[in-house]
Amino acid sequence: MKARVSSENLDGAGLLVVANDTEYRNTMYGAYTNETVIPIASASKWLTAATMMTLVDEGKVSLDDPVSKFLPEFTGAIGNATIRQLLSHTSGIAQASCIWEEQQTLEQCVRTVAAQKPAYATGTKFSYGNTSFSVAGRVIEVVTGQSFEKAFESRIANPVGMIHTRFDGNYYPTESNPVPAASAESTLNDYGKFVQMIFNRGQLNGVQVLTEQSVLEMETDSVKGLNTNADAAVQTTGIPTYGLGTWRDVTTTDDVGVITSGNGAYGFYPWVDRSRNGYGIVFVFDQRGSDVAVPESQREMHWVWAALDNLGVPQTSTPTTTYGR
């Protein structure tokens, strides 16, 4: 990490590594501190999926509910796209530029999305993108009666203790049209608490933020039976299997997610490692493009795994398949 900061002239970076209840690294490099806020890009998706799962836990939403149940502007076949498909990039909803337009509201943008032709038949393809998460964010608004930002704050950020994490911060300053897939910013400490909560199967500091079943749903393969290899994001990450808002970097031979992650375009790379009983984050804001920044952070994560193995950190003996570049 230190070499990356120097060679790429980055402001800083950070590394968090926890395994078997031991914190092996919580180190900042360059000008970064544990409270430095950076954009986390698509690692936002993990947060949005978790926010939706709180509604599932309360019985207000089912993952198999059609989007039209909450947003009647979605008509025809696309109205049958389910909440599960919104969170797994299999809904068929076409990408829309309005998700980036600050002068719109999330409601206005999603109405525009609903009027578009589907990109493909619902459930027939994995197409990684951002727009379906805006639709999911709007569902959250309708069900809770709150803005997406407020719903995230009350349901995830506050109980987890993510005091510096926002979807409408300095890097994307709009509360009216946040991008649930990509506009969050966070700190190492904040997101570290989130992955700790996911690792603990929904619990943190005695608070059950998510049920264990919801965490399991997020880590379960949602694209089984689909050929994902042609997708650009799969080609970048080398990971062909996806859950709900999270990639499945390592799976067992019976398809249980062992290591899941939520990598972002600027190289921010958080993970939960059930094989070594831990979690971690490569904390970096690397603007060289996702095709460079993400694989480099992924390699650093793999180096962490190798270092833990060299230290003799116990690992599950279950046969696994590891994906990545």
Question: For each predicted feature, which ranges?
Answer:
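A short, well-structured edge-of-sheet supersecondary motif
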Residues: K2-T33, W100-E101, G161-I163, P270-D273, ...
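Active-site SXXK
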Residues: L15, D21, I38-D64, F133-E141, ...
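Active-site helix/loop module of the DD-peptidase/beta-lactamase fold
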Residues: N34, P39-A43, L55-A94, A115-P118, ...
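Extracytoplasmic/periplasmic, Sec-exported soluble proteins
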Residues: E35-L47, G59, T75-G79, C98-T105, ...
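Solvent-exposed loop/turn segments at secondary-structure junctions
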Residues: W46, G92-A94, F133, Y172, ...
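Active-site Gly/Thr loop motif
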Residues: H164-A182, L188, T220-I281
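Short, gly/Ser/Thr-rich active-site loops of penicillin-recognizing serine hydrolases
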Residues: N227, G289-R325
